Amino acid sequence: TWLGCQEEALKYNDTCTLLGGDGPANPHTQYSAIEQARASKLYSAFAISVTKSEFIVDALSGIDTPVVTFDSPFSEGVSDASQGYIGPDNQAIGADLAKIAQTFLPQGGSLCIFTAIHDPNLRQRVAGVRKTLSKSIIHPYDQKLTGEHGWFEGDRCPLNAGDNSRQTMDQMDAFFSEIHADMLISVGHWPIINADLYRKTTYPYRHDLKTRKTHVVVATGKVQSSYTDLLSDQLIHGLVSIDFKEIGRMTYLRMRQAHKGEPIPKVTYTQNYILTLEAQTQK
């Protein structure tokens, strides 16, 4: 996202600065980065990918610098803390993941969702999965599927990735060796971000994947060649791709508009892309 923001900023002789610590998203690190950025008085606008809405909104109390969110917005109760959101329609990402699942299992089946707790954007993706599979726009986002249109979520699901590669692979191994669901829907890229490690972890279960006894569908950012190789080898079965560079580009433009006092849309959605082996074969 930052790369797209910086490339767009350079067109206007401007700079897009990336703040915050390295590693997994952390609300306390984000809170501290916002405090320091405000105190520096160096910035004309802020763009925040929200980690924990009710906590982070306190860091913005009394701010007079324009604020937008990208990728992960504030939750509905505090959405007025930003002037606008730029990024994917997170419920649509979940819906796209669910639609891929439906093409493989039109009568439904057993399901496990892979997510990470606290992130508002991921809650919306999970909601999109459940609403689409249940065929109910009012299905509560935190209510597991219990047979709606043939879909059941296992007792040990959803799984929590925790933005930690070791935990992710431990959870993946447990999914294959103990949970035995028909479908794994990961609302983030954690399982495949290290494709070699994913191959190693799933090696004992490759027959189930290749014969589609078990299906894996993943939301990701830019589609890497290692991901399409996993598709070709039928070790995963579908991807929903988010264009983070475009998010960055649009985020800069909205910050620039807000700084100039121009009105900006409350929501600016970027496009998602669906990729399956069948779609690859048809190209």
Question: What residue ranges belong to the model's regions?
Answer:
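Periplasmic-binding protein-like
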Residues: 41-50, 66-71, 112-115, 179-189, ...
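Flexible loop/hinge segments that line or gate small-molecule binding clefts
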Residues: 54-92, 224-232
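Short beta-strand->loop
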Residues: 87, 112-120, 161
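Hinge/cleft segment of the Venus flytrap/periplasmic-binding protein
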Residues: 133-140, 144, 240-283
